[in-house]
From Swiss-Prot:
It is found in: Cellular thylakoid membrane. It comes from Thermosynechococcus vestitus (strain NIES-2133 / IAM M-273 / BP-1). Belongs to the PsbX family. Type 1 subfamily. The gene is psbX. Involved in the binding and/or turnover of quinones at the Q(B) site of photosystem II (PSII). PSII is a light-driven water plastoquinone oxidoreductase, using light energy to abstract electrons from H(2)O, generating a proton gradient subsequently used for ATP formation. This is Photosystem II reaction center protein X. PSII binds multiple chlorophylls, carotenoids and specific lipids.
Length: 41
């Protein structure tokens, strides 16, 4: 039973890391898209 808390924390860390990575990629893509639009104007 001592394994479950560490596993829970591990999964929470993985999830938060994935969310942070996803947000970072979304921001980078948005910035590049905005840059393209501004250059085409």
């Amino acid at each position: 039973m001592t394994i479950t808390p560490s596993l829970k924390g591990f999964f929470i860390g993985l999830l938060s890391g994935a969310v942070v990575l996803g947000l970072t990629f979304a921001v980078l893509i948005a910035i590049s898209q905005i840059d393209k639009v501004q250059r085409s104007l």
